Design a protein with these regions (language model features):
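Short hydrophobic segments within beta-strands
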Residues: 8, 38, 88, 125-126, ...
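Alpha-helical recognition/docking segments in bacterial nutrient-uptake
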Residues: 3-113, 117, 189-193
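Short acidic capping loops at alpha-helix termini that bridge into adjacent secondary structure
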Residues: 122, 155-158, 219-225
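Flexible loop/turn connectors
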Residues: 185-306
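Short beta-strand elements in bilobed, periplasmic/extracellular small-molecule ligand-binding domains
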Residues: 28-39, 145-177
């Protein structure tokens, strides 16, 4: 039969997940495997439907590009006893399946350190819903706050996270961009003294940039902006985005390698194969400084005095 791998993704409009898919597909192709991609759109019913299809579809492996929803953790573990399963960004120790983890806390700290070195003290962090279902998001924010706490100015960070319902809003495929755009507009109404705004990922940062542009606020002269993921579009915006490169494509390849190792390790039951383990990504994250961050300077002071 066809050598088939299944990839379950929550979103294919965010370039981050497309890059993961590209990494998985390139490695799978090298090994003669085809892919079946399931886009859940963060819809619990769709996720459940896809998971229940797996017993009939019988793929040789399953890769989740984010954590499964909490209500399906047991179902995923049950599946993993028959089919190799790997999860990217799993930071839930209770889920007994193979995982490729990334130190999201470290990414947050790197973002904070860059802004602190540029003299930014009053900053905002814009994020999607910070739910237990998306633990990696919270880890990134926690890392950012920890760096500011060590500098003694944690109380100078404004966290603006979207409502939880937005994760379930399937109708708007550009929801992460809208989070950045709409929460930045709210932020500008609420406070006048921030010198930098961080987006949890590049898509949110693009929304931030457009909201600032509409408000005639100069980037980075008035407000610095930073994202994370180093997606292709980070180099294509009006002002190229400062971001963090954490080698997303390679994470996809790593997850595929885990599955291949499980498949090749034994031809008998999955329980006889390699033991469950967590694979930490070995690629060191890298700060990519482009055109959207600069020193906190006089432009910001002039903007505040005008208001």
């Amino acid at each position: 039969r066809e050598k088939l791998l299944v990839v379950i993704s929550p979103n294919l409009t965010n370039p981050y997940y497309v890059m993961l898919l590209q990494g998985i597909e390139s490695r799978a192709k090298e090994q003669g495997f085809g892919l079946f991609v399931c886009n859940t759109q963060r819809d619990l019913r769709m996720e459940e439907r896809y998971l229940k299809m797996m017993w009939e579809l019988k793929p040789l492996g399953i890769i989740y590009t984010c954590n499964p929803s909490h209500c399906f953790m047991g179902l995923v573990e049950e599946l993993s006893r028959e089919i190799p399963v790997a999860i990217i960004n799993n930071q839930n120790e209770k889920l007994n399946v193979d995982a490729v983890e990334l130190d999201n806390s470290k990414l947050g700290r790197m973002m904070a350190k860059h802004l602190l070195e540029l003299g930014h003290r009053k900053v905002a962090y814009i994020a999607p819903p910070l739910t237990t279902r998306q633990k990696q998001r919270s880890k990134r924010v926690e890392g950012f706050l920890k760096e500011f706490a060590e500098a003694g100015i944690k109380d100078q960070v404004i966290i603006k996270a979207a409502r939880e319902e937005l994760d379930l809003d399937v109708a708007h495929i550009d929801s992460e961009y809208k989070i950045g755009y709409e929460l930045t507009r709210e932020l500008l109404e609420e406070t006048k003294d921030i010198t930098a705004i961080v987006g949890l990922n590049d898509m949110i940062a693009f929304g931030i940039l457009d909201a600032l542009y509409e408000a005639k606020i100069k980037v980075p002269g008035d407000i610095s902006v930073m994202g994370c993921d180093n997606t292709l579009f980070a180099r294509m915006h009006k002002v190229e985005l400062t971001t963090i490169e954490h080698f997303v494509i390679f994470k996809g390849r790593d997850a595929c390698d885990i599955i291949m190792k499980k498949i090749s390790s034994h031809n008998n039951k999955y329980s006889d194969m390699e033991p469950i383990s967590t694979y930490h990504v070995e690629y060191e994250p890298k700060l990519i400084v482009r055109g959207t961050t600069s020193y906190a300077g006089e432009n910001s002071k002039k903007r505040r005095s005008k208001k």
